[in-house]
Amino acid sequence: MNVTKAEIAVSAVKPEQYPDGALPEFALAGRSNVGKSSFINKMINRKNLARTSSKPGKTQTLNFYLINESFYFVDVPGYGFARVSKKEREAWGKMMETYFTTREQLRAVVLIVDLRHPPTKDDVMMYEFLKHYQIPTIIIATKADKVPKGKWQKHLKVVRETLNIIEDDKLILFSAETGQGKEEAWAALERFL
């Protein structure tokens, strides 16, 4: 896909702040600091539309990025970040659940995991949650540039087996550094547009 226009449209914490209209949305989920913002920036050929941070837990709102005036990427707060209070975690959970279970514009969730490590318990819980609600999911195994090419298949197998990925969901090897998997990711997303 050729992205000619991309802008942050809305930062929201509750449904009444979500953008109006019926444009399709793709939510980006994953643990804190896994590379959701880097994924957005690579996909749209921008250096820093989505702010990246080395500090986990930076994204605290649902950030809606309007792409080509035809759909949104929705960056959701990362999970599994230890240094937030129980109260904040509960508020986060409620915000996420509300969005994922009630938003009609949501077409699919892009679940981003780190190829270097087996998916965490939080990754597994997130994937099971998405499957429970029958939300189509595209799994992006990112940071492929940090794993030797000869070990990619072995690492992908661990991701596939740990998450117990169903046949309909696509698993894509990705690198925000090299652009590996970008075309495949666009092809997977375009199926839902």
Swiss-Prot record:
It comes from the Bacteria. Residues 22-193 form the EngB-type G domain. GTP binds at residues 30-37, 57-61, 75-78, 142-145, 174-176. One of its GO terms (cellular component) is cytosol. One of its GO terms (biological process) is division septum assembly. GO terms for molecular function: GTP binding; metal ion binding. Mg(2+) binds at S37, T59. Its cofactor is Mg(2+). The keyword Cell division applies. Keywords: Cell cycle, Cell division, GTP-binding, Magnesium, Metal-binding, Nucleotide-binding, Septation. The keyword DNA repair does not apply. InterPro entries: G_ENGB_dom (IPR030393), GTP-bd (IPR006073), GTP-bd_ribosome_bio_YsxC (IPR019987), P-loop_NTPase (IPR027417), Small_GTP-bd (IPR005225). Necessary for normal cell division and for the maintenance of normal septation. Belongs to the TRAFAC class TrmE-Era-EngA-EngB-Septin-like GTPase superfamily. EngB GTPase family. PANTHER family: ENGB-TYPE G DOMAIN-CONTAINING PROTEIN (PTHR11649:SF13), MSS1/TRME-RELATED GTP-BINDING PROTEIN (PTHR11649). This is Probable GTP-binding protein EngB. It comes from Geobacillus sp. (strain WCH70).
